[in-house]
Amino acid sequence: MSINEEEYLRLEEEIDLGDIDFTDLEEQYEADLGYDNYVIVDGAPIAPEAKVPILIKVLRKLFSTAGEIVEGDEGIFMPMENGKSKGFLFIQYKNVADADTAIKKLNGKKLDAQHRLLVNRLSDIEKYGSVSGEFKEPEIEPFQSHGFLQSWLQDEQGKDQIVLHFNESVGVYWNKKTSEPEPVIEPRRGFTSKYAKFSPKGTYLFSIHPQGIQAWGGADFHRIKRFFHNQVRLVDFSPNEKYMVTLSPLPITLPDSTAERAQFPFGPESEGHKLVIWDMETGEPARTFALPPHLENQKEMQWPLVKWSFDDKYCARQGPDALAIYETPSFQLLEKKLVKIDGIQEFEWAPAGVKLHNSKEANEHLLSYWTPESANQTARVAIMQIPSRQVLRTVNLFQVSDCKMHWQSEGKLLCVKVDRHTKSGKTLFSNLDFFKVTERDIPVEKLELKDVIVNFSWEPKSERFVTISRLDDGNPNPAIPKNSITFYAVEEGKGKNANSKYKAYKQIENKHSNTVFWSPKGRYVAVATISRSSGEIEFYDVSFDDETSKKAAPANVKLLKTDKYSGMTNIAWDPSGRFLAAWSSSWLHTIENGYRIYEFTGNLLRDDSVDQFKEFIWRPRPESLLTSSDRKKVRSNLREYSAQFEEFDAMEADAAVREAILARRKALEDWRAYRAKHAGKKVQTSKVQAEVIEEIKEEIVEEKEEIVE
């Protein structure tokens, strides 16, 4: 029904529009009032009216750095009250993009020592000023179970899982020794744009993408969490998987859209930063950092940039002449200040808690660092206790070219490999300084050598170690085998107060070997030559037991096996120390790509050539939950367990043997079931009387043959 103009005017006079609630329509149809190019600035100085033009001129100059401001009084309006400014002002930019730039660039800007400017979009002030005062129950997402994330540890045969990265696909498999690896999940094409990586305890598998990092886990490796970090390149983890560290070459940039900012994981305080520490439980960033200026222009990035204490309680970053140590989970600076160390070159955390001499604390947090020589000071190596920052031990060094710090896995010993030069500077040689951390006053044993050590490696949970060294004779020809492999162990001193010292128990000269890989369980070590032209692996037993070995000797080295592997690029032990994998990666060359799996004794189990093979990854295992008594029980029943695993191996190797073993097990189960069924029944005796049966056998005692003619 239509109405004329007179009726409309009459209704308009009768109806008060102020009594009508238009809230539902306003929420449904949001009007663009054109305020997005206005910003409101709070925190400005309160100035008398006479000085307001000067203040406006200063602020116009500052805010013009973000974009073009509308000319005249329309561009900047500063409210007045009682002859003074109110401390805030309105600025109109010519476009929305300039207003966004002003918010990003100038929000939090210090105008002077007493005034910090707070810049917000005018439309946001109106939006957040109209928030309802009524409490609204937050919506909690329903709990989503990811299953048992360590289910692979329940495998009856104790098999390990491996990741094979080839072509553009990534697959997870069970290692089955000589047999074809059994897929846990089918290979996924495009699983990662760069590489895949497990967390330190094997709980999560991570894939790298242009948008960020994806965490996978569970029995079927389903998606668990996403971590948005644009163009991320590097990733690292804290030892107990509580935190993840990512690095991107691109700085964090806040989205322009308000809706996108609401979903963005980073706030304004993270803008321009490149390094992010993530909380693995929540999936949220715990702290972000800008790269120090001295790292921004480096072609090769030192990684990791953040190093962790053994229990994730502390982390630290190295900067110019200082060490920044943070407490978790707040990630605030320890005691709110840096640790000043002039010229610090490198630092390392002890990999385990340390029991210092005469200390009640069983798990002290220690870190070591070194500083180079300067005009007024010698080079130094020091051990510091955290959180007290107390320097427990310092050693001065002379004519130092470089230092490398190697902590023993239990944190009881620190070896510092010191590369020194002669006074002429033409010849290099190495010294080894051993800090005995758990003893009184932390004594230091020095081992002086004539060679340059190119590789050093501790045996896990032991005082033995292996070095690869060469004589610096000025002839760098790589075709000449000049490296020496040396096996060291502690020789106990004779007498009551005699000190122990390190002794070389075996040396093998004229080798090309350049890398050392200890089994995670110790005793067995692989010494390898890794190069693009040739490759070789030698397997050694450092506690070989035979009739000629001395029972009390701390080391008896025996070469078990040697295998040539041309084009080998990488080597890795499995977590149990039973197997070693070596592979040729297409990331470095395209010659005979593939992988090999060996037993710890060096026997070759599997040799697979795979086109465009990139990487072989063992899935890590968490530390064993067995107590010392549990381990003792396992050792006492080792023969029984060995028989079970040998049976498993026989079944895997031969289908006929498998069928025979399964049939034998079935027959045994049937027999036991039959016995259990009839065990309680009484035997019915027969009424037939017993009778003795006689049996007569004829036996020929002698036989004669007579011939009649």
Curated annotation (Swiss-Prot):
GO terms for biological process: formation of cytoplasmic translation initiation complex. Residues 37-124 form the RRM domain. Its main location: cytoplasm. Residues 1-221 are annotated as: Sufficient for interaction with PIC8. GO terms for cellular component: cytoplasmic stress granule; eukaryotic 43S preinitiation complex; eukaryotic 48S preinitiation complex; eukaryotic translation initiation factor 3 complex, eIF3e; eukaryotic translation initiation factor 3 complex, eIF3m; multi-eIF complex. It is found in: Cytoplasm. Keywords: Cytoplasm, Initiation factor, Protein biosynthesis, RNA-binding. Residues 1-98 are annotated as: Sufficient for interaction with HCR1 and TIF32. One of its GO terms (molecular function) is RNA binding. Belongs to the eIF-3 subunit B family. Component of the eukaryotic translation initiation factor 3 (eIF-3) complex. RNA-binding component of the eukaryotic translation initiation factor 3 (eIF-3) complex, which is involved in protein synthesis of a specialized repertoire of mRNAs and, together with other initiation factors, stimulates binding of mRNA and methionyl-tRNAi to the 40S ribosome. The eIF-3 complex specifically targets and initiates translation of a subset of mRNAs involved in cell proliferation. This is Eukaryotic translation initiation factor 3 subunit B. It comes from Lodderomyces elongisporus (strain ATCC 11503 / CBS 2605 / JCM 1781 / NBRC 1676 / NRRL YB-4239). The gene is PRT1.
